Structures are given as structure tokens and as C-alpha cells.
Amino acid sequence: MELELDLGDLDLDVDLDADAEPAEPRYSPEQLANAKGTVGVISLGCSKNTVDSEQMLGRFVREGYLLVADPLEADLLVVNTCGFIADAERESRESIDEMAHIKQLYPHKKLIVTGCLSQRYGAKLLEDHPQIDLLLGAGHYDTLIPLLEAKAPQTVDHVTEPDAAASHDVPRLITTGESSAYVKIAEGCNNSCTFCIIPKLRGPFRSRTLDDIAAEVALLTDEGCHELILVSQDTTWYGRDLPQRSSLTELLQRILASCEAPWIRMLYLYPTLVKKELLQLIAREDRLLPYFDIPLQHADSQVLKRMQRSERLETVRQLVKDVRASVPDAILRSTFIVGFPGESEAEFQTLLDFIQESQLDWVGVFTYSDEQGTAAYDLPDKVDARVAEARRDQLMALQQPITSARLQRWVGEIVAVLVESYDEEHACFVGRFWAQAPEVDGQVLIQCNEELEMGIFVPVAITQVLGYDLYGDLLEVDDLPPDEELA
């Protein structure tokens, strides 16, 4: 069951003014009287958490609750947290505090906290935030509404071991617009990266079945979704844990047979599992976007060894060559960590050299976050935070002109752009073409003199590069060159 929801309904619009009045109600008195209550949700963290939030919202709607964007209108304040690194934890705790402040102003409201932060800290989170009425971890969201509606008094802490990824028959309110949706193909992770706490929070890798995913993508595309974005902690590991062993390649073939979505994108591909069979399939099938999101984390062999990653400098070099040889129009995106314990100037220079050599299309850079509970937390030779930040800035300064140069090849080309929003500041419509993933990459700014419908493909002639974005003119479909298709 898939429904659509405007993004504004997912993230609460917070105003901490003690004298603030609720915004103009979006529901009639009759609707409010017939509803079980009103719910507002703050969803933090990654795309996998977004899917969890969408399923929570779907369950609330199915059970007769109304969704609101203004927390002053909400009877239930839900914060779905992220606890991956220090910055994410800080944002989650600030959001909890903001909702707790509103609860103090309006004591009848209930504050529910879910997600990775509650999975990580459990009862300790209740000590830090005593205003919480109900605490759930990273999963078992099917128990949320029964716990809230139970007649007998309930304990607050209901954090348990995480469960499997929810199936397609769980109601879900899509928050990413009518044209694009994340498809979570698995839960958990089997890798042992020393910097990462996710396996402790989300458990081991558990794949959804081929049938279940096929049913979901068919439903999504039947309802007008043009872009399916496959996500998990390690998308290339898919199917290896199933009783009847499968693979990402088999899943992709099943998805192609199950739906007509023109864009099928994969995120979080573990480098050592990007094999020839997968590359050949992507090269062969036009609907499988040749967009490779492969988090490499570093390029120096010794740093990778301390991170407990399988690859080494020569293997990551070879991977880039293999992808481009097999899929000539491939877009390569990766993320890197700088300031990992023991990272020397020479090891950092190896990373800089790799960035210059590999000419990746998109790069994200993070400073190492020293997380208690990870193996890296106990490593010696911690890098000073100021040094790590300087290295991050240096790496991004190196990558920016590379990205701009890679984008230049699109100038003069006509591309199909998926229209997603209108930018008031620049007075233009905004969308993405196939080489841009949502939220993490640049966008296409569309110059036109007409109103465009959201969620459709339009032909755009790219005229210039603006930082990480592209700028272009809207064309009529009749202006497309022969054999040019929109998707």
C-alpha cells in the first residue's frame, strides 16, 4: 500500500515561541472529531530511515490518525532519530529537546522517540530526556500504535533487537514526491568496518525476498513513480543470506521484469562486490542507470587496513578502471573519511593523489567521528580535529574543479530532466537528470516561460555549469533530435 505525501508533512515546522498559536488548521472540525488524533514526525538521517518514517506514517493513517506539519497541532510528536556519528546524534538530541519543550507547553501531547539513537542508548536516552513517553529502537514499528493505544499503563522503554525490513504490504506514505521513491531491499550489515556502529544498531544483513521487492516496485510504478532508488547498508550483498541464495544481479533482473520504471538507481555499492556480471547487466539495460555510488572511504592501503576494509589502493584503482571500461558513460560517486586514527600526511597525500588520478564525478568527504562502541574508538594516534577539518577542506577544494570539469561535458547536450520543485530565489524550475542522485548531488536549473508539472520528464538543453549544478533551457518535445528519448 503506497500513498503520496507532501514532504512538508514529514518534517515538523518548529517554532519554540512560548506564545505561539497553532497555524490555521488544515482539517475541518468534523475530520478532527472523527480522527484518533493528530501526528507530526521529524525524520532524521539516511534514506533508509526515511523509508522507516514513511512506513510509520502509513500505519498512523491506516489506523485513523491525521498528519500535521505544525507541532502545535500534533497530539503525538514523533522523532525518528539518527545516531550514526556525533553530528547526527547532536541533531537528534536537539530535535528531541525541541519537541520536549513543546510538550512542556502543552502537557497533553505525547513524545515518541524511535530510530538509531534510541537503539544505541536505550534507557540512557530516557535519563537524558525524561519527557519521552515512548521509546522504540530501529524497528518493530508495528508495535508503536498498539503501545500508544493500550488501556493498561505501559513502560516507556521498548527498545529490542532490530527486526527485518518491512514488507511491501506495510502501508507507506511516500514523502519524496510522486516521481521518486526509495526501495529498502534489506536491513542491517555484515561488514566490520572499524569506524562504523551500524551493525550494532541495525543487526546483521537481512534481505527482503525477491517476490516482496518485486511486488513493491510494481505498486510504486503503477502509481506513477519514475525513479526507483534501491538502498540498504550494503546493496551488493543482497540475497546472499536468503535460504534460496540470490544476488543483486538477479534482483535487478526481477525488477526489470516487474515494472516499467525508466530510472532504476542503486546506492551503497560495496566496492569488492561490484563484479563483472553486475557491470555487464548495467551496460546492457538502459533502465539501470549507470550511476555507481561506491563508498571507498580511503585510498591508502594502510588506512584501509586499519578501517578493516577489504580493498587496497591497487584494487580501488582497478575498480575505477573496470567500471569505466565496462560502462563507458558511468557516473562515479564516492565518499571518503579523513582524519582516521593514525592517518599520516603521507597517507593523506595518497588519497589526494587518488582523487586527482581517478577524476570521480561526485565526492563526499567526512571527518572521522570517534564513536564509542566501534573498534576504531580504541585505536591510538588520534588525529587532531582541526587537522582533520583542514584535510577535508583541502580534499574538497581539489575535487570541486574536477566535478566542474566532469559536468562541462553536458554543456551543449539535451538531457531528460525530472521536474521536482520551483526555486523562488532563481525564478526557475529545478530537477535532476539521470547522473544526479537526490539530495547528495547537484541539480538542473530549468529556464522556461511556462508552468511545469511536477514529476514529469522534460527536455532541457544544457547551457552552462553553475558550481555543482547545471543550467539549461526548456525545449519542446518536438525539438528533440531524432532517436532522442526523454527517459
From Swiss-Prot:
Its EC number is 2.8.4.4. Residues 408-476 form the TRAM domain. It comes from Magnetococcus marinus (strain ATCC BAA-1437 / JCM 17883 / MC-1). Binds 2 [4Fe-4S] clusters. One cluster is coordinated with 3 cysteines and an exchangeable S-adenosyl-L-methionine. The keyword tRNA-binding does not apply. Disulfide bonds: none annotated. Keywords: 4Fe-4S, Cytoplasm, Iron, Iron-sulfur, Metal-binding, S-adenosyl-L-methionine, Transferase. The gene is rimO. This is Ribosomal protein uS12 methylthiotransferase RimO. It catalyses: L-aspartate(89)-[ribosomal protein uS12]-hydrogen + (sulfur carrier)-SH + AH2 + 2 S-adenosyl-L-methionine = 3-methylsulfanyl-L-aspartate(89)-[ribosomal protein uS12]-hydrogen + (sulfur carrier)-H + 5'-deoxyadenosine + L-methionine + A + S-adenosyl-L-homocysteine + 2 H(+). It holds the Pfam family Radical_SAM. [4Fe-4S] cluster 2 binds at residues 189, 193, 196.
